[in-house]
Amino acid sequence: MLTLYGETFPSRLLLGTAAYPTPEILKQSIQTAQPAMITVSLRRAGSGGEAHGQGFWSLLQETGVPVLPNTAGCQSVQEAVTTAQMAREVFETDWIKLELIGDDDTLQPDVFQLVEAAEILIKDGFKVLPYCTEDLIACRRLLDAGCQALMPWAAPIGTGLGAVHAYALNVLRERLPDTPLIIDAGLGLPSQAAQVMEWGFDGVLLNTAVSRSGDPVNMARAFALAVESGRLAFEAGPVEARDKAQASTPTVGQPFWHSAEY
């Protein structure tokens, strides 16, 4: 079970709702993955006219999965705060995935503005899930601001590169053992999702890896299974890697001709 801000969710997978081939494929992908939450941009939900926006919102409601609005596209504190407040009215939720982009090419989060915006929103009663980098100090500042969970990236949004800074992510996990950490952005394969879950991360958020795959519905299922298996592996406790071979079969009771002494 995934616990965020005192609320428990049956899945450790979160799924984005952008860039699917058709609304029906989006709906089927959500139903197949059974994610804890689905993320949606206020701008996306309201685009294409009132009828289109209402239809998209109705589709999301039909899935029965909790909605996590985000502030995608925001580049200033005021813009992010205003968008979050509007999203709370539209989606009737205090949950917000806080995104504040500092660079248009890498889509890297602006951690300085992120901390400021998080402080404002938390004081306003929001449950903030900040999209951040794997920088330990920046993550600590977000926790100091009142965030109870973090969403560090694995790689830049949409790249599918997997965990490019494995060392930093593992350090983050080690130094913040009691903080829910959800890997957000940069994963492209189910095996990459399983890997970060094996490292002890609490969840994974995906969008592009599913929506732009050849078969989003089956890819959604593949990622759901990968997240589950990765978590099971972490909880089971994998064997430690060794430099030398170690026989798995015991030597006790071997025939005399296999003995080292004759």
Swiss-Prot record:
**For 1-deoxy-D-xylulose 5-phosphate, which residues are the binding ones?**
G158, A185, G186, N207, T208
Q: Give the matching SUPFAM superfamilies.
A: ThiG-like
- Gene3D superfamilies linked: Aldolase class I
UniProt keywords, alphabetically: Cytoplasm, Schiff base, Thiamine biosynthesis, Transferase
Cellular component terms (Gene Ontology): 2-iminoacetate synthase complex; cytoplasm
Q: Give the GO biological process terms.
A: thiamine biosynthetic process; thiamine diphosphate biosynthetic process
Q: Which domain of life is it from?
A: Bacteria
Which reaction is the catalytic activity of this chain? [ThiS sulfur-carrier protein]-C-terminal-Gly-aminoethanethioate + 2-iminoacetate + 1-deoxy-D-xylulose 5-phosphate = [ThiS sulfur-carrier protein]-C-terminal Gly-Gly + 2-[(2R,5Z)-2-carboxy-4-methylthiazol-5(2H)-ylidene]ethyl phosphate + 2 H2O + H(+)
A single MF term (Gene Ontology): thiazole synthase activity
Main subcellular location of this protein, as a coarse class: cytoplasm
UniProt pathway annotation: Cofactor biosynthesis; thiamine diphosphate biosynthesis
Instruction: Give the EC number.
Output: 2.8.1.10
Task: Provide the protein's localization.
Answer: Cytoplasm
Positions the record marks as coiled coil are: none
Question: Could you confirm whether the keyword Cytoplasm appears in this record?
Answer: yes
Q: Does the keyword Transferase apply?
A: yes
Active site annotation, chain numbering:
K97 (schiff-base intermediate with dxp)
The record, for InterPro entries, names: Aldolase_TIM, Thiazole_synthase_ThiG, ThiG
User: For the region Disordered, what residue ranges are annotated?
Assistant: 243-262
Q: What does this protein do?
A: Catalyzes the rearrangement of 1-deoxy-D-xylulose 5-phosphate (DXP) to produce the thiazole phosphate moiety of thiamine. Sulfur is provided by the thiocarboxylate moiety of the carrier protein ThiS. In vitro, sulfur can be provided by H(2)S.
Q: Note the subunit structure.
A: Homotetramer. Forms heterodimers with either ThiH or ThiS.
Concerning its family, UniProt says:
Belongs to the ThiG family.
What's the name of the protein?
A: Thiazole synthase
Instruction: Give the organism, scientific name.
Output: Neisseria meningitidis serogroup B (strain ATCC BAA-335 / MC58)
Q: What is the lineage of its organism?
A: Bacteria, Pseudomonadati, Pseudomonadota, Betaproteobacteria, Neisseriales
